[in-house]
Structures are given as structure tokens and as C-alpha cells.
């Protein structure tokens, strides 16, 4: 049969449906004939009794599958109430599926070739079932910690690590008391064998899925009940959660890693991927057989863990995770369906609400016992049953933390007897006998106390964006008290060495876990770790410099280790913090190539004051996750509640409410360009604003419904115990217990919006060089056949970052518009929505799902990251600095990410380069710029890293707010970073 005829036959929907029906029927026989396959849908834990429908958008193909009591039945048509309906854009898409693995099917969700209605958990299980029928798709053999690091590359041991060091020296300034040379240039990573060993493990151990947490909490609820206890009484969510956490922490394996100065681990693996089935854990279901073999960020998984997740854990949580609870509670809302198209916005509450910072100084000063005693007293005094339940929850959860510490103490005592280095384990046991139950007396106890509580928090809340705050100033009193007891000279110098080693150990403890990212998420959040932000410097509550000895200890550790997490952020207050401090921040950026991010303290404080934060509280702000501000212990802001694609609103305004990729009427009809709408630019701007408002309100409604789901599914009693407000109000943080209760928005695509609007305004309305219909046609054609118009757009229209007054005013107008839209709405806890302009890696993901734009950006190309000008003619570093610094911080209270890619001149010395970059940074901050982050690396180096990744294992880059290892990024994201304008200094 000729190929054309064969294609025509297979392409016939009737024939294609018949073929698909036959394939599914053959599958159904497998469940009858093979007990192993039958266990996929019926086993000792229960049965998969669901209906899955499959149809094309034009309904030319309609089939459905019924799973019931261990059998699979295939039928024609689509039932009225399927649990999941999979909709294919066309019959051609169904044909393509023959060559895809089931987890690759989910990647089709990104491009909207595949959409679905119904329960995503059931779709994930169906994909896993299909995966078991796919030949040759199994992952690699599993052995925890034995293989190379994530990213798909396999460097030999001790190769590929870039080693650099600072050269500059300084004298004490700000509030430095003991460091005679604050830059600490006498020390290198070579002086710390233990840190070198841990760094080697970090870059060679493959992440491994850890089912410990998921298994324990699931077993607890199977034994005791979830919605109702075994007596039939409805369980109070916060108390239920506390009891589960106590069970988890009581039964969690106590581990003290070799070479570590700190006891306790987040997971039972060297580098563990934690599963939160009540959050987004079920997204791993389709990949349980293949995740260890995927190209980007592969995870090992043991067969026992795979079995327990598939058979017990994921089925239990299929309807009890936050996403599905919100769906069922709101009758399958449209705003949730739009989120699951991945093009318009991404809602982080489906994963976490952990972007916040606790009151760690309270923990360090007093320990857990006073909080337990306070909760017990309040419980006795409370008259209301719900309040008594809340206080009991605080007490119960914190006792779980102490039980975990007690088990670590016992493990240290055991190792002191059985292992070598008995003195080390005895010291750990002595510390664990005191902390975190009581206040810390020295730096070692403070770090140990902090770490145990940090482990507990990550077993309560998703390891995404939960941040550590001002560790330099919070640990400084313990450093000072230790130093005061030592003689100047060798004793104090030895202690500085010890402090560096201890903080280095803490950094690697923070690296012992990774967030779960499904393969489809690698395009959305490429290379991101847990983003545990630490904030240094700035001013204290009274407005005085907070730069201290520990600030420089942390900076030196950052320089020596050059790791992506913790995500280091530094506050710089012009006129208060010293030039020597700013110069050191720049030098560490130059050595590491990408960290820390630097923030203008004055601008951020003013921005927070303008939206209702008290000045004293605003002065204590610290970065959360990426760059977002949080007031530690007072402000529960979920600062990354959503990633909002503003460009989608522009595309919808250009298409009368239709989104081109989705090919559906999404927003309101606001006027057809092809029919002569929009007589003036203001008419089109109003259409854009209306589409923007429509999308924003969808996200707000969804965020609020997800927040209510968190109240019922996963309250946070441990986190609430270290906040001001919850105990006084007898309210969990998820219910509005904190003093400040905002929600943070990340607005993506501002540069692309401004440049597009300027093109429309200038060429269509002001200069009339083209008409709107022609411009729309050019955009639809990706400018093919409209090359002259494209050249005119790129060369004649002033761009964002050029410091042209008209462009700057338009940029501020767009910022004001989106600020007003969000700020005037309240969240489920009664707080405001605060906007910021940063993008993680979603500027690439959203860009690859979007068409060409009037700015001249071509189809499927990334948007510009954060609040960064595009790499075009007429935009240089100075004009960019003036443009960004001229925007009003008061309208961007969730902060910005201004990415600057710097290529040092090879003719300049190290000191000259540092001084030049420092001068630019200082000018930017003095002009009022909010934030600046660097990639100090040449384009040539990045291209070589793409070709020879084995030589660049620790090449650090700033994406947009967070750090990543360049060689672990998706190719599209690598190319986006390479394409950024390279500024010469």
C-alpha cells in the first residue's frame, strides 16, 4: 500500500477510532490474563474503580474505559459523568501518541494538544497504568547515592568543579567586632577536608525519591481516619495534622551523616526528593517506572518505595490533595480548568504555601518548651472547643519535634560507643539533650536547634520557598559570646575557622533534599532547588547597620562552596551600610558568578510601608524563596502564590478574547482588530486592561479556593508556633492567624508588554506607518512576509530600558494597572495581593507557549526574565539602570528581579573589575533601584558549558530570582540565558 493511501486510511477518524478501540481491548485482556497487571487496578489496598473518557475536540472520536473490580471495559461514546475526560486537539494528536511514553503525554498538556476535565490524580494513575504497557521504558537500576548528579551528565569524580577565590581584603567596618580582615581571604575550600567531602557528595550523589514521610502520614491516617476518627467524630483539621506530625516525627529515622557537624536529616536518603501526597506528590505517579531514566533531573527510586507510593499512598490521597479538594469543593470551576492549561498562570498553592520565614530568634533564645507550656496554659483557660483543639495542636506537634531530637540524641550516644570519633558524637548528644527544647548557649547549639526545627518544618510544609531569614544577625550574639570567652589571637582565629566550617556544614545540610519536580515541570521550573533564602546585612529594627561578623562568615562560605542553595540574598542600605560591604557583595558575585542577589534596603522598606507595614517591621524584611519580602514571624504572605502571565492578556486583547495557542474564547470580547475596532490607542489599552483584569480575577478566585483547601487539608501548627498572632488569636496561619496576611504575585512579561504597546502606539497611532490589521497579520504570520515591518519595529521603536521618557511612563502605567487590579482584591485571609516582577523560569515556559508579539519577538521565543530589558539596540547598562531605578517601588511591593549579565574585560585586574561593577551597583541603588542580580560570566563560557557540561558541574547562574547549575537547565532556558545582553565593564 502506498504511503499516502496508508496515511489517509489511518487519518480517517472512523478507522482511527476502531484501531484505538482494538488497542484498548487488547489492554483489557491483559488485566484478565496477567495477575501482575491486575494488581495495578486491584490489590490488597483497594481497587481503581474509575471511568476515563477519550475524545477529540471535534468529537469525531469518542471512547471510554471503565475500570471496576479489577477489570477494564472499553466502550464507544462519552458518558455524562466520567471521572476524567481526555480531549485531544485533533485525530492527528492521537496518532502521535503511538510514539510517546505516557509521561511524555503529559508534556502535551503544555502545548494544549491535550487537555482534560476532571481529576488530575486519576489521570496520573491512568498514565502510570499505560506506562506499564509501554515496552522498554523502565528506568535505570536503583542504588541510592551511587550515580552522578542530576542533569543527565556523568562527570568523573573530582572533575568539572570550577574553583575560584576572592582576592580583595578589607578592614572592620559597620558592626564587625572580631574579624580583623572581614573578607577572610586567608581561607579556601582546601582548608576544610570535611566540606570538600560534602561538596563532592553534593555533586556526585543522584537524588533519590524518599517515601518515608508519605508512607508514615498515610499509614497514620489509614489507622486513625482522616475526615472522621474511628469513633465517627469529625476531626478538627489542625489537631489532626498535629497528631499526624507527631506520629511522623516519632517514627522518622534519626540519622547523623558522616562528616557532618549537625545531627538530623530531612529525608532518609543522601539527597532525598520528598513526597507530599497531600500537595503535588501525585504528579510523580506517571513516572514511577521511568523517572530514573529521564533526561533532566532524574531521580532514583527503590522498588519498595515505588510499590508503596503506587499501591497505598497515592490512591489514599487521590481525592484528598489540595488541588482535588478545591476542585470538588467548587464544582469543577473554570478558573481551575484554565490553570491546568499551563499557558495563562500557574498557581503555587497546588504545591505549597510555604513561602515565609518563622521567628527563629525566639526559638534560639528560649527553645520549644516555653511555647509548649504557653499553649498548655491557654488550652486550660480556653472556653471554646475549637480554641482548645488549636492549642492542643501546637502542644502535640511541638512534642513531636522534641521526640525527634531525643531520638537523635540516642543515635549520637549509640554512635559514640560504636563508631570512631566518639568525642564528636558525645558533643552532639550533649547539645541534643538541651536543644531545641531550651535556648541555645553557643553558636553550635544555635545552629543545631535551628536545623532540627528546619527539618520539622519541611516535614510539615512543602520544601519550596520556606526561608531562613537573617541568619547573620540572629546568630551574631552566639558568635560574640563564644568569642568573648577566648583569647585574642590563635584561640579566636581557631574559632573563626570553626564558625566557617559549621556554617559550611549547615549549607550542605540544606542541600540534603530537593523538591519534587515532575518531568513536565522541568520546563516550568528548570534547575530550581528548594530556594531556601538566607538574607544578610541591611539595617536592623532601629535603622542601624546590621552588617556584622557573621555577615562576612556567610559570605565567605558562599564564596568557597558556590552552591545553588541556600539562595543567598543581601540587603544594602545606601548611606548606612559601608562601601566595603557592597564591594564584598560584588566580589562574591564575581567569584561565584551569580550570588548573592543584592537588594536596596531603603527602596524595599519604603515599598512595604506604602502597603501597610509598620516601619519597624518593614526594616526587618528578608527575602523569601527568590526575592520576595517577608517580615519574619509576623507576616504570612505566601509571596509566590502565583506566576501570572501578563502577555496572555495582551494576546487575548489582540484576538478579541481568544488565546491563540488554546484556540478558544477565554476572555471577554473586547473588539476585533480585523473589523476596525480601536480607533485610538486608549481604546486598545482599555481592552488589554479588561483582559488583564479578567485573568487576574480568575487567579484570585482560584488562589482563595486553594487557600481554603489548605485550611482543611494541611494546616501548619509547627510553623504557627513560631509566629506572632496565632496563639493570641487561636488561629492557624492558614486561617489568618498572622499579623500580616498578604498574598504575593509574580507578574511575568512586563518588558514584552511595554515594547509591544509602544510598537502599537508609535507605528499604528502616532506615526501611522502601518495599520493595526496589517500589524496583526504580521504577528499571526510570525512576521514571515513582513520582514520590513519587523525591521522597522526592531530599529525604530524605542524599547524598555532605553530610558526614553515615553517608554518609562508607559511601563509605569502598566505596573500601576496591574498593581491596582490585584491590590483592590482581598485574599481568603483578609489580606491584600501584592505584585512583583520576577519570573523564576516561567518567562521561558510561557514564552515557548506564546505566539509572536507586536514587539517583534518571534513565536515560541522566551519572554524577557523578571524586570529586565530585552537585548536590543539602544539599550545598554546605564540606560537600563536609569530605567529600572526610575520605576516606583511602592507599586512593586513583592520586589523585582533585574538581571545583569556582565562580561569583565580581560585587560582589567580582578580589583578593577570589582570596583567598576560596584560603582554601577552603587549608582543604581542611589537612584532608587530595588534589586539587582548578576551573571558574571561570558557568553563564550556558557556556550562551552553546553558543549562540555562535564567541565562545568558547579557553574552557577541566576535565572530570575533563584540560582541554578547551568548544565542542569532545559536547553531552552540555557539558550535564554546565553541570549541575554552581555554588558561590558
Go through each PLM region and give its residues.
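Short, Lys/Glu-rich amphipathic helical modules
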Residues: 412-425
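Amphipathic alpha-helical repeat elements characteristic of tetratricopeptide repeat
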Residues: 106, 406, 472-473
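Extended, non-transmembrane alpha-helical coiled-coils
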Residues: 403, 407-410, 414
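Conserved catalytic cores of very large enzyme subunits
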Residues: 160-394, 423-985
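Short linear functional motifs in flexible/disordered or boundary regions
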Residues: 77, 124, 138, 417, ...
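Charged, alpha-helical scaffolding/interaction elements associated with membrane systems
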Residues: 99, 111, 418-420, 484-485, ...
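Feature captures hydrophobic
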Residues: 1-158
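Extended non-globular scaffold/tether segments
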Residues: 392-403
Amino acid at each position: 500500500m502506498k504511503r499516502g493511501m496508508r496515511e489517509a486510511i489511518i487519518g480517517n477518524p472512523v478507522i482511527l477510532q476502531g484501531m484505538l478501540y482494538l488497542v484498548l481491548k487488547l489492554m483489557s485482556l491483559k488485566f484478565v490474563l496477567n495477575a501482575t497487571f491486575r494488581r495495578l487496578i486491584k490489590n490488597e489496598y483497594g481497587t481503581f474503580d474509575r471511568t476515563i473518557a477519550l475524545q477529540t475536540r471535534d468529537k469525531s472520536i469518542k471512547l471510554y474505559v471503565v475500570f471496576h473490580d479489577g477489570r477494564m471495559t472499553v466502550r464507544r461514546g462519552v458518558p455524562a459523568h466520567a471521572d476524567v475526560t481526555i480531549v485531544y486537539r485533533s485525530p492527528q494528536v492521537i496518532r502521535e501518541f503511538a510514539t510517546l511514553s505516557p509521561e511524555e503525554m503529559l508534556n502535551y498538556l503544555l502545548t494544549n494538544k491535550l487537555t482534560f476535565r476532571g481529576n488530575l490524580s486519576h489521570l496520573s494513575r491512568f498514565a502510570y497504568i499505560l506506562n506499564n504497557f509501554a515496552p522498554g521504558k523502565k528506568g535505570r537500576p536503583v542504588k541510592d547515592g551511587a550515580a552522578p548528579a542530576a542533569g543527565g551528565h556523568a562527570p568523573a569524580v573530582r572533575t568539572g568543579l570550577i574553583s575560584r577565590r576572592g582576592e580583595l581584603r578589607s578592614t572592620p567596618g559597620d558592626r564587625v567586632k572580631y574579624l580583623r580582615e572581614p573578607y577572610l581571604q586567608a581561607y579556601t575550600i582546601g582548608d576544610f577536608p570535611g566540606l570538600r567531602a560534602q561538596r563532592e557528595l553534593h555533586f556526585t550523589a543522584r537524588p533519590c525519591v524518599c517515601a518515608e514521610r508519605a508512607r508514615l502520614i498515610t499509614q497514620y491516617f489509614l489507622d486513625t481516619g482522616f475526615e472522621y476518627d474511628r469513633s465517627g467524630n469529625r476531626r478538627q483539621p489542625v489537631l489532626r495534622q498535629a497528631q499526624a506530625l507527631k506520629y511522623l516525627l516519632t517514627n522518622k529515622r534519626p540519622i547523623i551523616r558522616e562528616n557532618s557537624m549537625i545531627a538530623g536529616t530531612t529525608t532518609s536518603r543522601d539527597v532525598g526528593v520528598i513526597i507530599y501526597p497531600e500537595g503535588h506528590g501525585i504528579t510523580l505517579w506517571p513516572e514511577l517506572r521511568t523517572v530514573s531514566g529521564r533526561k533532566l533531573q532524574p531521580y532514583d527510586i527503590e522498588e519498595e518505595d515505588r510499590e508503596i507510593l503506587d499501591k497505598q499512598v497515592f490512591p489514599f490521597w487521590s481525592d484528598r490533595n489540595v488541588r482535588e479538594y478545591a476542585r470538588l469543593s467548587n464544582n469543577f470551576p473554570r478558573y481551575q480548568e484554565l490553570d491546568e492549561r499551563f499557558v495563562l498562570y500557574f498557581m503555587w498553592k497546588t504545591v505549597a504555601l510555604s513561602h515565609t520565614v518563622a521567628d527563629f530568634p525566639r526559638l534560639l533564645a528560649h527553645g520549644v518548651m516555653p511555647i509548649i507550656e504557653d499553649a498548655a496554659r491557654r488550652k486550660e483557660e480556653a472556653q471554646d472547643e475549637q480554641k482548645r483543639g488549636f492549642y492542643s495542636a501546637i502542644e502535640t506537634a511541638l512534642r513531636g519535634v522534641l521526640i525527634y531530637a531525643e531520638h537523635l540524641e540516642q543515635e549520637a550516644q549509640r554512635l559514640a560507643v560504636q563508631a570512631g570519633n566518639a568525642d564528636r558524637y558525645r558533643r552532639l548528644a550533649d547539645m541534643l539533650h538541651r536543644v531545641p527544647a531550651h535556648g541555645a548557649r553557643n553558636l553550635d547549639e544555635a545552629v543545631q536547634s535551628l536545623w532540627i526545627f528546619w527539618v520539622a518544618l519541611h516535614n510539615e510544609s512543602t520544601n519550596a520557598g520556606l526561608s531562613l531569614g537573617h541568619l547573620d544577625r540572629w546568630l551574631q550574639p552566639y558568635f560574640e559570646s563564644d568569642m568573648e570567652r577566648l583569647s585574642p589571637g590563635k584561640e579566636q582565629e581557631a574559632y573563626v575557622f570553626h564558625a566557617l566550617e559549621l556554617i559550611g556544614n549547615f549549607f550542605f545540610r540544606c542541600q540534603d533534599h530537593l523538591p519534587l519536580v515532575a518531568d513536565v515541570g522541568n520546563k516550568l521550573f528548570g534547575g530550581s532547588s528548594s530556594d531556601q533564602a538566607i538574607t544578610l546585612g541591611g539595617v536592623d529594627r532601629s535603622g542601624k547597620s546590621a552588617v556584622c561578623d557573621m555577615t562576612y562568615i556567610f559570605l565567605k562560605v558562599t564564596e568557597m562552596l558556590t552552591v545553588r542553595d541556600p539562595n543567598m540574598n543581601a540587603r544594602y542600605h545606601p548611606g548606612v551600610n559601608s562601601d566595603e560591604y557592597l564591594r564584598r557583595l560584588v566580589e562574591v558575585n564575581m567569584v561565584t558568578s551569580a550570588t548573592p542577589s543584592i537588594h536596596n534596603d531603603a527602596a524595599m522598606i519604603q515599598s512595604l510601608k506604602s502597603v501597610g507595614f509598620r516601619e519597624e517591621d518593614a526594616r526587618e524584611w528578608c527575602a523569601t524563596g527568590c526575592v520576595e519580602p517577608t517580615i519574619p514571624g509576623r507576616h504570612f504572605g505566601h509571596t509566590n502564590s502565583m506566576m501570572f502571565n501578563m502577555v496572555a492578556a495582551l494576546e487575548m486583547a489582540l484576538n478579541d478574547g481568544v488565546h491563540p495557542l488554546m484556540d478558544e474564547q477565554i476572555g471577554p470580547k473586547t473588539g476585533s482588530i480585523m473589523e476596525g475596532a480601536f480607533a485610538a490607542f486608549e481604546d486598545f489599552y482599555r481592552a488589554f486592561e479588561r483582559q488583564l483584569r479578567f485573568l487576574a480575577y480568575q487567579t484570585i478566585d482560584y488562589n482563595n479556593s486553594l487557600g481554603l483547601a489548605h485550611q482543611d487539608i494541611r494546616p501548619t501548627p509547627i510553623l504557627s508556633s513560631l509566629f506572632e498572632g496565632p496563639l493570641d488569636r487561636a488561629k492557624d496561619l492558614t486561617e489568618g492567624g498572622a499579623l500580616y496576611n498578604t498574598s504575593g504575585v509574580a507578574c511575568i512579561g512586563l518588558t514584552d508588554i511595554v515594547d509591544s504597546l509602544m510598537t502599537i502606539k508609535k507605528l499604528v497611532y502616532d506615526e501611522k506607518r502601518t495599520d493595526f490589521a496589517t500589524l496583526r497579520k504580521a504577528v499571526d504570520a510570525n512576521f514571515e512576509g513582513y520582514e520590513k515591518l519587523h525591521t522597522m519595529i526592531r530599529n525604530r521603536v524605542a524599547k524598555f530600558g532605553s530610558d526614553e521618557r515615553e517608554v518609562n511612563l508607559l511601563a509605569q502605567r502598566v505596573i500601576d494597572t496591574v498593581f491596582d487590579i490585584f491590590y483592590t482584591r482581598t485574599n481568603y485571609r483578609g489580606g491584600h495581593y501584592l505584585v512583583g516582577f520576577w519570573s523564576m523560569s516561567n518567562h521561558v515556559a510561557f514564552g515557548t507557549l506564546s505566539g509572536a508579539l507586536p514587539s517583534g519577538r518571534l513565536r515560541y521565543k522566551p519572554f524577557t526574565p523578571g524586570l529586565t530589558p530585552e537585548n536590543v539596540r539602544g539599550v545598554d547598562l546605564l540606560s537600563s539602570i536609569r530605567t529600572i531605578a526610575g520605576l516606583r517601588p511602592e507599586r512593586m511591593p513583592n520586589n523585582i528581579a533585574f538581571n545583569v549579565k556582565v562580561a569583565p574585560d580581560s585587560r582589567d585586574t580582578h580589583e578593577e573589575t570589582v570596583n567598576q561593577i560596584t560603582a554601577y551597583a552603587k549608582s543604581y541603588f542611589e537612584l532608587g533601584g530595588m534589586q539587582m542580580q548578576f551573571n558574571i560570566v561570558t557568553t563564550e563560557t556558557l556556550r562551552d558549558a553546553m558543549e562540555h557540561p562535564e567541565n562545568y558541574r558547579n557553574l552557577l547562574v541566576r535565572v530570575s530570582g533563584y540560582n541554578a547549575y547551568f548544565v542542569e537547565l532545559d536547553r531552552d532556558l540555557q539558550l535564554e540565558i546565553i541570549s541575554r545582553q552581555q554588558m561590558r565593564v
